[in-house]
């Protein structure tokens, strides 16, 4: 059970005769949260030579819940809503490598649809973020016991961020580029 889940609330509010759209955090009422998680990781150390460094990782999370959200800033009335920022289904699958001073990880992470904002004005509909899958790559090489080199590529598939008001009315689409990074690490 959940009591007082903190969530942002947006409402058009009149201040000094002028209407402003105000967003601020507030405690919600009671809610419920239930779910299950499954994960497994296995290295294929039964394979010969450098192949023994390969492995795989998988995890899956299922969450269901609801929450009582206030119907207005100063209201004592509540309505049952989804939990803000909580996707019902999420999973991660990765191919791993560790051996001969090399580490690598190619991973796909999927986050399901989730509600980002309850009853967004002026349409009074929930803002829903659409499911997205990100694919990332990380490769490291140990030059010697004290120095290692790391390469990262985030969002290889250039997955986009998409939100809508209610289930169908597009609100926001952002095209996210692939981000690359290189680092050199020293151990003292």
What does each model-identified segment do?
Residues 133-136, 150:
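Outer membrane beta-barrel transmembrane domains
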Residues 8, 68, 159-162:
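Active-site-proximal flexible loops/turns
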Residues 28-29, 79-83, 123-129, 170-171:
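Short, contiguous acidic/charged loop-to-helix segments that flank catalytic cores in large enzymes
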Residues 88, 130-132:
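Short solvent-exposed loop/turn micro-motifs enriched in small/polar/acidic residues
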Residues 1-3, 54, 110-119, 140-188:
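C-terminal beta-signal and adjacent terminal beta-strands/loops
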Residues 4-10:
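A surface-exposed, glycine/aromatic-enriched loop/edge motif typical of exported proteins
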Residues 15-118, 157:
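Gram-negative outer-membrane beta-barrel transporters
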Residues 23, 134, 179:
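Short coil/loop residues immediately preceding or within conserved phosphate-binding loops
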């Amino acid at each position: 059970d959940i009591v007082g889940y903190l969530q942002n609330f947006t409402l058009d509010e009149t201040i000094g005769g002028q209407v402003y759209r105000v967003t601020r955090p507030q405690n919600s009422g009671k809610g419920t949260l239930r779910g299950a998680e499954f994960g497994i990781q296995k290295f294929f150390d039964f394979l010969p030579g450098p192949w023994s460094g390969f492995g795989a990782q998988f995890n899956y999370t299922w969450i269901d819940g609801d929450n009582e959200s206030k119907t207005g800033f100063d209201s004592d009335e509540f309505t049952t809503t989804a939990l803000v920022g909580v996707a019902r289904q999420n999973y991660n699958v990765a191919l791993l490598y560790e051996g001969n001073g090399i580490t690598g990880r190619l991973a796909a992470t999927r986050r399901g649809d989730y509600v980002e904002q309850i009853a967004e004005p002026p349409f009074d509909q929930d803002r829903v973020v659409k499911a997205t899958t990100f694919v990332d790559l990380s490769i490291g090489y140990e030059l010697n016991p004290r120095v290692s080199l790391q390469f990262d590529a985030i969002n290889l598939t250039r997955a986009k961020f998409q939100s809508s008001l209610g289930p169908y009315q597009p609100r926001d689409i952002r095209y996210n580029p692939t981000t690359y990074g290189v680092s050199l690490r020293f151990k003292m």
